[in-house]
Amino acid sequence: MKANTMFIILCLTLSTLCVSSQFTSVLGKIFVTNRAVKSSSYEKYPFDLSKEDGAQPYFMTPRLRFYPIGKRAAGGMEQSEGQNPETKSHSWRERSVLTPSLLSLGESLESGISKRISINQD
C-alpha cells in the first residue's frame, strides 16, 4: 500500500514537472528548448554570453558558423579566413606551419632517448 502511494506521488510529480518545465532531456543531458543559437555582441568569445533571454551561465550554447560549401570547394575559403582575425588562427596554412612533422617528432624522440641512455650509463 505504501509503495503504491509513493509510486503514484512520484508519477504525478514527474508528469507535472515534464509539463511545466522548459527543459527537455535528450540522452541524459538537459537542453533549453526555447533558446536558439544566435550571434552575440561578444564576438571574441566562443560562447554566447548574452543573457537577454534569462538563460543561466551553465546553459551557454557555443556559436555555430556555417560556410557555403561551394566557396570552400573552390578554394576561396582560405583567402577569407586569412582576412578574418577570428578564424585566422584556425587557418590550415598556419596550422601546417606550427604543427611539427612526424619526422621531426621522431628525430626529437630518438635524440631524447639517446640522451637519457647516455645519462643512465654515466
UniProtKB/Swiss-Prot annotation:
UniProt region (Disordered), positions on chain? 74-95
Signal peptide interval: 1-21
Please list the GO terms describing molecular function. Answer: hormone activity
Keyword annotations for this protein?
A: Amidation, Cleavage on pair of basic residues, Neuropeptide, Secreted, Signal
Keyword flag Signal: yes
**What GO biological process term is on the record, naming one?**
neuropeptide signaling pathway
Main location group: secreted
**What's this chain's function?**
The atrial gland peptide A and peptide B precursors are the source of the 2 peptides that, upon release from this reproductive system gland, initiate the egg-laying process by exciting the bag cell neurons. These neurons, clustered in neural connectives near the abdominal ganglion, in turn release other peptides that act directly on the ganglion and also, via the circulating hemolymph, on many other organs to control the physiological processes of egg-laying. One of these other peptides is the egg-laying hormone.
The name under which this protein is listed is Atrial gland peptide B
Recall the taxonomic lineage recorded for the source organism: Eukaryota, Metazoa, Spiralia, Lophotrochozoa, Mollusca
